[in-house]
């Protein structure tokens, strides 16, 4: 007779198998926001997709909720979009489309089980895609590749496969194959079912694509497809067969092989086939490294970690939300959990399902899900919450910024608003904020990957906190954390041509003017270990 524990375990495993969680990585302008919207369209989460860069009378992108995103037509913050398709629950972790916000993307990838690598068919692999691929590789994420914009002039499909294999070291397996390219792109051939999917353009892709499905050997095929395209397709199929590669799911799940899909997100060609295959081949929620070792998602007690904080998602209520990835067990509304960093207990009374800016209170959640929790200043990025035995998940890394500037508040009457705004934007990781160790220099130092991060901080301080600010750039371009902390820095003695500051967690950070300056310090102080990446949320208390 099956025990209650066995029944609960079976239910848990069944729930896990029907969950998929993924983030999309791409270079700017590869079509990430468009693909995101089309996946939501097919998932029934929206009924009409609007192009972000289209005319003003078209709808704004669902995933772009911040005022500055709507004004500029770019994604500058990550968000979560949950929807159902077939009998799966899908958590789409939407990442910023602009390269200046790559650190937000890094944090989001820490919560993902799968990655979708989006490539422009004309451009192939681009710098930002390569950077983000390296993060996926470190985390051994399965990578599914969608070659986009096949309806425009582009490179030969075989050239793109060769580039991925040569430059990323991934085996490739085309799950489907394009029929034509550019203005002669007609659809794709599905290798698993040996069927041809021909698409019709509709409303600039704002509604689901209509398709005609034909068996490869159907004699009526020439009624639908030009002879030269049909014969070229047959040659391509023969060539793929000669290459002999088979789809190896264990290799896919280990991040060694990438399934390749061809299509056009703008016109919806190939999007549904991609979504269907991803659900079949994608990885269900998996175990994560913790202080207790790798915890399987079937571990009975609830655990999760904070990978993102966001202030003022609802301008009317000036709220602050912590994005929590559920890792193990079952989350239930009103449960009391332990906060690993502070040792306190917290009642989670209003957990929310997230869909960009929209939210709804939920009763329960399972591993792979992302929930929103009200954050009255309790949570920091990387925090672990848990029930049962004490544990802590690995911290989320903090990457080296390249631009630095003092942030000034010229209006003393706005001091409180300025302090509050800076503190809250620092907590959510909108930008790294460093502090001078000179007690007479009170102005915070903004540290960013790109100039647009500075603009966003100033824009949000003005629009959300009513504070106008000015920037004073600093002539530094590299930051390194000191291994061993202040004791190691004191032991090293005097350092030339560097600026010593401290980060949010009170740790020493050295700023260098250039690479030569950094190398000189390393040569003069060989025992001083400098790191370009610092972990966050590993038990260290932030300093105000």
Curated annotation (Swiss-Prot):
Gene3D superfamilies: P-loop containing nucleotide triphosphate hydrolases (3.40.50.300), Peptide chain release factor 3, domain III (3.30.70.3280), Translation factors (2.40.30.10). It comes from the Bacteria. GTP binds at residues 26-33, 94-98, 148-151. The keyword DNA damage does not apply. Keywords: Cytoplasm, GTP-binding, Nucleotide-binding, Protein biosynthesis. Pfam families: EF-G_D2 (PF22042), GTP_EFTU (PF00009), RF3_C (PF16658). InterPro entries: EF-G-like_DII, EFG_III/V, G_TR_CS, P-loop_NTPase, PrfC, RF3_C, RF3_dom_3_sf, RF3_GTP-bd. It is found in: Cytoplasm. One of its GO terms (molecular function) is translation release factor activity, codon nonspecific. Increases the formation of ribosomal termination complexes and stimulates activities of RF-1 and RF-2. It binds guanine nucleotides and has strong preference for UGA stop codons. It may interact directly with the ribosome. The stimulation of RF-1 and RF-2 is significantly reduced by GTP and GDP, but not by GMP. PANTHER family: PEPTIDE CHAIN RELEASE FACTOR RF3. Belongs to the TRAFAC class translation factor GTPase superfamily. Classic translation factor GTPase family. PrfC subfamily. This is Peptide chain release factor 3. It comes from Microcystis aeruginosa (strain NIES-843 / IAM M-2473).
